[in-house]
Design a protein with these regions (language model features):
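Glycine-rich phosphate-binding loops of nucleotide-dependent enzymes
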Residues: 2-251
């Protein structure tokens, strides 16, 4: 088996008496979707923030592509290929679809926002941006204001922005949030197609999507991973059913 693309070992993070991460270890392997599930307040978003570099763990390590990145910040990790999408959209709603992707391409090259206007005319950056939009199926919406996109299209746009970083792994924090059944089904198909681009660590409450997509699932409860396994393993695990899935998880 090849080495993990992303390897988290024994992460601890506390806020006062609250242990948000209590010895968390997990990995993400090439070509897979590894889902992270758990009840509200389990520490999922805190864990993603530590992996992305927005929070520094109290102890433990984050290795990415064989490199210890525990002490690196968000920007450096992104440039190495950690592509994050957000639970709450970080897109610039008044900008066009293309402009949002150009901003991502600028950041990927370490160029500052003040260079945005000349970047709009940069043929190389525009090619990168249009290629990313084509990959997510938004090329025909390039000139549209981002605020006019549907919720699902905004999620696709977030992925396009992440693609400009040439990601080695995607960190996705509740991409299905706010979607109806139809939108969730469409986005599930889209995410399934992304695994050939880069593996995905997927934080998600939509269990239909998780069970359809995940190669492996880790269950986080009160800052601890209580189980990791295949969909079948997790569905049948008594501790997981008691802590999170309930009886519907066996249906």
């Amino acid at each position: 088996m090849s080495d993990p693309v992303l390897n988290i070992q024994n992460l601890h993070k506390s806020f006062g008496a609250l242990k948000a991460s209590d010895g968390i270890s997990l990995d993400v392997r090439a070509g897979e979707i590894h889902a992270l599930i758990g009840p509200n307040g389990a520490g999922k978003s805190t864990l993603i923030a530590q992996i992305a570099g927005g929070l520094r763990p109290d102890s433990g390590s984050v290795h990415f592509m064989g490199r210890d990145v525990t002490r690196l910040g968000t920007v450096l990790r992104a440039r190495l290929g950690l592509g994050r999408t957000f639970q709450i959209s970080a897109l610039a709603m008044e900008y066009s679809v293309l402009q949002n992707v150009l901003l991502g391409a600028l950041g990927a090259r370490g160029r500052v926002f003040a260079m945005f206007k000349p970047a709009v005319r940069d043929a190389g950056l525009r090619e990168v941006a249009f290629n990313a939009l084509e990959q997510v199926g938004l090329q025909d919406h390039a000139a549209m204001r981002t605020a006019e996109l549907s919720h699902g299209q905004r999620r696709q746009l977030e992925v396009a922005v992440a693609l400009t970083l040439k990601p080695k792994v995607f960190l996705m924090d509740e991409p299905m949030a706010g979607l109806g059944a139809g939108g969730s089904k469409r986005l599930t198909g889209f995410l399934d197609s992304l695994r050939s681009e880069a593996p995905i660590l997927l934080v998600e409450h939509d269990m239909d999507a998780v069970f359809a997509l995940a190669d492996r699932i880790s269950v986080l409860v009160y800052g601890q991973i209580i189980a990791t396994g295949t969909v079948e393993n997790i569905r049948s695990d008594p501790a997981v059913r008691r802590a999170y899935l309930g009886e519907e998880g066996t249906a």
